[in-house]
Each structure stands twice: as C-alpha cells, then as structure tokens.
C-alpha cells in the first residue's frame, strides 16, 4: 500500500499543471521627447558623431533625471530582447543614482529625437575607495583589485558598463543610422579620452 500510495502521489504531481507567473514588470512609458530635449542642453553636448550626424551627450542623474530614466527604460528593453534584463520596469541601480553617480554617455539622434544607445562610466579619479582599499564599483564583485593596480593604473582608468544600442537601431530600420550606431558610441568614448587627460585605460563588462 505504501508503494501504491507513493506512485499515485507521483502521478498526481506529474498531472498537475504548474502555475506560470511572469516575473517581468511592465516597462515604463517613454519619456516625452520635449522633456528629454529640455535636459539635453549645450553644456552637456560632447561632440557630433563622425557618421549619421548624431550628437553625443554626457549627463548624470542629478542634472538630467528624465534622460537617465529614459536610458533605464531603453536598457531594459534592449537587455530583455537579448534574453537578459533586470525584470524591473526600468534598468537603473544605485550606481546610476547615488550622490557620486556614474556618468551616462549617450548618442542622440536629433532627426528622430531619440536616444540611439549609451554607456555609463566613471573615471578612476572619482572612484570611492573603501576602508579595505577596494573601490566601490559595479565590477567590484567580480575582481579584487591589487595594490599595484590601485596605485599604478586606477588613477588613469575608466570603468565602463551597461552599454546598449536601442532596439530600433540594432536593425536596418534606421538605415545608415542603425549601421553606424556602435561607431557613434565609440566616437563618444574617443572624445572622453581626448578631453580627460588622465585617461589611459578602459575596462568594464
């Protein structure tokens, strides 16, 4: 009877249809274009891109909160499409919104009035160092930085992360605009190296 009861219980479990829940939150609505344009002021403009006539800006949560929210929305869409994503309604974390936040480098399409893609980054000179001598970075859980690295490399290093290209610019839907999306982002990274004389090294995930 014991074996029969066990077999029957297993049959009941096998015949039970599991309840499937969707852990993904609904992504927030797009930030209105006029709100974004109001925050993309000339003082945040870094350069024009070499191709596609797009614009590169550098913003932070403190000076452009709506632009950063839109970045979080677009990141989540792009990462979900690649099988990832945070599952939250937008992809922002404490490194984006803290008192000493990562800067956000974005490519802006002035014709379509939308963000093409972006990176977030923080200069070595701005790293916050803990009592253990380790920097508080998004990659800190992946590495233990040696004393030599912190002394000889960190001051001249930029940590990069959360790179994305907006979904529509990952295809041919935007023609040449889409083809050169990554080139445009690299234009921005190149400009950072030029305007920041301390930068020699780039790393990230």
Residue positions per predicted region:
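Non-catalytic C-terminal accessory region of glycerolipid acyltransferases
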Residues: 1-23
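Conserved N-terminal entry element of GNAT/NAT acetyltransferase domains
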Residues: 20-62
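Generic detection of long, well-ordered alpha-helical segments
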Residues: 26, 30, 61-72, 179, ...
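Short amphipathic alpha-helix that is part of the acyltransferase structural core
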Residues: 48-93, 104-117
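Acyl-donor binding region in acyl/amide transferases
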Residues: 76, 126-205
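A short helix-loop-beta-strand connector motif used in the catalytic cores of GNAT acetyltransferases and
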Residues: 96-106, 129
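Short, well-ordered loop/turn elements at secondary-structure boundaries
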Residues: 99-103, 111, 115-116, 153-155, ...
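Short beta->alpha transition motifs characteristic of CBS
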Residues: 119-126
């Amino acid at each position: 009877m014991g074996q029969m009861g066990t077999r029957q219980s297993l049959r009941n479990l096998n015949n039970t249809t599991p309840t499937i829940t969707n852990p993904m939150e609904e992504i927030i609505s797009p930030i209105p274009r006029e709100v974004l344009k109001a925050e993309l002021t000339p003082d945040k403009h870094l350069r024009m891109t070499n191709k596609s006539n797009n614009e590169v800006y550098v913003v932070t949560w403190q000076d452009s909160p709506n632009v950063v929210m839109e970045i979080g929305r677009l990141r989540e869409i792009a990462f979900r499409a690649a099988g990832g994503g945070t599952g939250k309604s937008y992809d922002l974390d404490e490194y984006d919104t803290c008192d000493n936040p990562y800067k956000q480098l974005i490519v802006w399409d002035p014709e379509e009035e939308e963000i093409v893609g972006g990176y977030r980054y923080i200069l070595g000179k701005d790293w916050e160092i803990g009592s253990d001598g380790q920097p508080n970075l998004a990659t800190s859980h992946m590495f233990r930085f040696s004393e030599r690295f912190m002394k000889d490399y960190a001051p001249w290093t930029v940590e990069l992360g959360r790179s994305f290209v907006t979904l529509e610019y990952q295809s041919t839907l935007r023609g040449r605009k889409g083809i050169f999306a990554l080139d445009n982002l690299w234009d921005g990274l190149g400009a950072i190296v030029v305007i920041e004389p301390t930068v020699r090294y780039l790393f990230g995930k």
